[in-house]
C-alpha cells in the first residue's frame, strides 16, 4: 500500500498536495504530513525508553490546548512541504520497514493510546497508510488496484473494535 501511494504522488507531483480530501477537509499535504509524523513516532517507540514520550509530548501539548491534529503537526513538520514532504515521508516509510522487519513481534511499544505489540503497531501503520491512501486516491479521482494484501488490516479492525468505544 505504501508503494501504491508513493507511485501516485510521484506521478501527480507535488502540486497535488493542495487538493482537499473528503476526510475532515484535510489536504493531501495534511495527510502525508500526518503519515510522516506517525511513521517517525512508530520508529521512536520501537527504540524504547523515553523516545516516544519525547516525540509525542509536544504534539499532545498542542492537542490539550485544543489544536486539531493537523494544527499540532505543523510545528513538528517545521516548514517541510511539497516534494520534500513526499521525500521525507517516503524515507520514514523505509525507516519503519527497516525498524520493524526484525523486531520481536511481541515487544510492547508505547503509543498515544494503550501500549500494543510491535506486530500490532506495524499493522496499524499499514492500516493507516491504506486508509489515508484511499482518501488520496479518491481525492485525485484515481482508482487503486486492490490486491489481497489487507488481511492484517481486517484483523486489526476486529481486535481493535472494543477500543474504539473507549474514546466516545
Language-model features, listed with the residues they occupy:
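A generic secondary-structure signal for well-formed alpha-helical elements
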Residues: 2, 9-12, 35, 39-46, ...
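Amphipathic alpha-helix face/heptad-repeat signature
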Residues: 1, 31, 85-92, 121-128
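Structured surface interface patches that mediate subunit assembly and partner/cofactor docking
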Residues: 47-59, 80, 102-166
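Short, helix-capping/interhelical loops that line the mouth of catalytic, cofactor-
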Residues: 40-97, 101
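Helix-loop segments that flank and shape redox-cofactor active sites
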Residues: 6-27, 48, 52, 99-116
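Generic alpha-helical secondary structure signal
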Residues: 3, 15, 83-87, 94, ...
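Active-site-proximal cofactor/substrate-binding loop regions of enzyme domains
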Residues: 20-44
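Conserved small/polar residues in nucleotide/adenosyl-binding loops
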Residues: 34, 166-168
Amino acid at each position: 500500500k505504501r508503494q501504491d501511494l508513493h507511485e501516485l504522488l510521484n506521478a501527480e507531483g507535488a502540486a497535488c498536495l493542495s487538493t482537499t480530501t473528503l476526510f475532515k477537509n484535510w489536504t493531501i499535504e495534511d495527510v502525508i504530513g500526518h503519515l510522516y509524523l506517525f511513521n517517525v513516532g512508530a520508529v521512536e517507540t520501537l527504540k524504547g525508553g523515553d523516545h516516544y514520550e519525547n516525540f509525542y509530548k509536544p504534539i499532545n501539548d498542542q492537542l490539550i490546548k485544543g489544536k486539531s491534529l493537523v494544527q499540532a503537526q505543523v510545528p513538528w513538520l517545521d516548514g517541510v512541504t511539497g516534494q520534500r514532504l513526499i521525500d521525507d515521508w517516503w524515507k520514514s516509510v523505509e525507516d519503519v520497514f527497516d525498524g520493524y522487519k526484525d523486531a520481536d513481534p511481541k515487544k510492547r511499544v508505547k503509543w498515544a493510546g494503550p501500549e500494543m505489540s510491535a506486530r500490532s503497531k506495524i499493522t496499524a501503520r499499514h492500516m493507516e497508510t491504506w486508509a489515508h491512501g484511499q482518501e488520496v486516491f479518491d481525492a485525485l479521482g484515481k482508482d487503486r488496484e486492490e490486491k489481497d494484501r489487507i488481511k492484517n488490516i481486517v484483523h486489526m479492525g476486529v481486535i481493535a473494535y472494543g477500543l474504539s468505544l473507549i474514546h466516545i
